[in-house]
């Protein structure tokens, strides 16, 4: 109750201050309707397809045998961020995982099934050769991280964890639909490691790529003169309550658009700064931000902290006279976490990723005040063999935009 009252007092103060400051605030030319240099000709891609790796009895430690080994073959691969240096050379960071994991069924007569998690991270250099005005061939090569999380039975390791770096190569074709949209299709090879009975991996995928091309001057000017406000800076104070885990469960299980976690947070406070770098005419804004956060776990009341940088997608749902309502989604923000063992669970090491999603509003005459609610998540995406994951429930935020 004290926290709620403090937030209410702070909100009223900010609203009063924003009204006063709006009288004399100088007008600055908005230069954020064109992609900044580091984003122009950058891209992301989403692909799905077929994966094969020779999982069998060979991966089991001596003394273990499975009744059967189920190897699903559907895989997803995304380029989280790529950049074209010119028409022929680009670099990209990728993430790949099977939709369903390998299962060892009936190990030593057990009635259940045990899963082996496989995940791959990659950083590759990509060369492109135009074949026609729309079709190009490409080859890629670089560094891959292979992460296998095995399982134990009765306190004994049945399939061991494996984590290693290796070269990775691939090739394929691209079909350019427009300057920004392309269809892609290709194959990828990642070597195994005999010393750990890890088989090599072959994946064939297809999908699409979106490239952020510099906008024409007419579009830039149209967006700039739209009359809709997009604050350039936002400073927010956030408080996590320890309540509302049903929201996390709903969006991670019932409608899988977010993630859960094994470690629960009881209380937390965070300070965020967001800087807008691009926006469209009315709906979309892209921010980059940083945050420092302090948390207390639910089970053991263990204290830990995080330091993050992150991208943030902001979508304005309604533009009304009293407020501009928006949704936010942030994915894979690199994070330092002070503890890796929390509530007797192994979350990996001191490197992880921050994700969050929520709703908010800019209010006040000049939209200087931001209020909102969101949920958070920390996870290394199983790029490390241990990844308990941290879920953070309903979090209230209050901020000042300028």
What are these regions (language model features)?
Residues 22-82, 201-275, 394-401:
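Short glycine/proline- and aromatic-enriched beta-strand/turn motifs that initiate or cap beta-hairpins
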Residues 40, 73-77, 115-121, 161-167, ...:
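Residues that define the transmembrane beta-barrel architecture of outer-membrane proteins
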Residues 44-52, 93-97, 139-145, 185-189, ...:
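Transmembrane beta-barrel strands of outer-membrane/channel proteins
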Residues 55-70, 98-118, 145-165, 195-197, ...:
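Flexible, solvent-exposed loop segments that connect beta-strands
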Residues 71, 193-201, 263-264, 298-303, ...:
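Solvent-exposed loop/turn segments connecting transmembrane beta-strands
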Residues 80-152, 207, 265-337:
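Gram-negative (and chloroplast) outer-membrane scaffold detector with strong preference
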Residues 83, 127-129, 173-175, 189, ...:
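Residue-level signature of outer-membrane beta-barrel architecture
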Residues 88-91, 133-137, 175-183, 214-219, ...:
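Repeated loop/turn-to-beta-strand initiation elements of outer-membrane beta-barrel proteins
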């Amino acid at each position: 109750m004290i926290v709620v009252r403090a937030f209410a007092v702070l909100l009223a103060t900010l609203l009063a201050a924003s009204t006063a400051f709006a009288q004399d605030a100088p007008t600055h030319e908005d230069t954020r309707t064109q992609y900044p240099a580091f984003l122009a000709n950058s891209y992301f891609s989403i692909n799905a397809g077929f994966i094969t790796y020779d999982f069998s009895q060979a991966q089991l430690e001596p003394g273990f045998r499975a009744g059967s080994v189920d190897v699903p073959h559907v895989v997803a691969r995304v380029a989280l961020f790529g950049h074209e240096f010119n028409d022929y050379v680009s670099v990209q960071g990728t993430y790949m995982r099977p939709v369903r994991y390998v299962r060892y069924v009936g190990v030593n007569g057990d009635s259940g099934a045990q899963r082996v998690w496989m995940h791959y991270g990659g950083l590759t250099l990509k060369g492109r050769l135009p074949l026609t005005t729309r079709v190009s061939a490409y080859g890629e090569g670089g560094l891959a991280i292979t992460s296998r999380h095995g399982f134990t039975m009765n306190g004994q390791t049945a399939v061991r964890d494996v984590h290693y770096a290796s070269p990775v190569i691939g090739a394929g074709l691209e079909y350019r639909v427009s300057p920004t949209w392309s269809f892609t299709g290709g194959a990828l090879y990642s070597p195994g490691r005999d010393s750990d009975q890890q088989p090599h991996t072959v994946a064939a995928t297809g999908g699409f790529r979106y490239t952020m091309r510099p906008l024409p001057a007419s579009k830039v000017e149209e967006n700039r003169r739209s009359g809709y406000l997009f604050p350039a800076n936002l400073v927010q104070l956030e408080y996590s309550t320890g309540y509302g885990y049903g929201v996390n469960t709903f969006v991670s299980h019932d409608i899988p658009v977010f993630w859960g976690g094994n470690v629960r947070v009881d209380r937390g406070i965070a300070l965020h700064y967001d800087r807008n770098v691009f926006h469209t005419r009315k709906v979309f804004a892209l921010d980059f931000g940083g945050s420092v956060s302090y948390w207390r776990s639910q089970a053991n009341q263990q204290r830990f902290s995080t330091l993050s940088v992150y991208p943030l997608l902001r979508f304005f749902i309604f533009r009304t006279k009293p407020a501009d309502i928006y949704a936010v989604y942030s994915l894979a923000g690199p994070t330092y976490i002070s503890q890796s063992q929390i509530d007797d669970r192994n979350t990996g090491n001191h490197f992880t990723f921050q994700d969050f999603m929520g709703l908010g509003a800019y209010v006040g005459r000049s939209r200087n005040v931001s209020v909102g609610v969101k949920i958070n998540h920390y996870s290394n995406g199983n790029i490390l063999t241990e990844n308990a994951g941290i879920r953070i429930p309903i979090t209230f935020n209050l901020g000042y935009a300028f």
